[in-house]
Amino acid sequence: MSKKIGIEQSLSDVEAALKEKGYEVVTMKTEDDAKGCDCCVVTGLDTDMLGISDTMTGASVIQATGLTADEICQQVEQKLQ
């Protein structure tokens, strides 16, 4: 079963990279979208607005600011090991 990764709308390059690696990717518009995700990738701009945190979702949250799509994929893989 593939792992479900939630990402913010603005991270389309990350979405493409994660899908290429076989992950199920969902776009998060509200905190409810993050529920059921194994990992969430956020830009930091909307973190508080969306209410996405590892304590709330039970998923690892990766801060994407300043990282390339490849670096984010590496972090996702590390968090899901």
Swiss-Prot record:
Classification via InterPro entries: UPF0180
Positions of transmembrane segments: none
Pfam families (UniProt xref): UPF0180
Family: Belongs to the UPF0180 family.
Protein name: UPF0180 protein BLi01634/BL05144
Organism: Bacillus licheniformis (strain ATCC 14580 / DSM 13 / JCM 2505 / CCUG 7422 / NBRC 12200 / NCIMB 9375 / NCTC 10341 / NRRL NRS-1264 / Gibson 46)
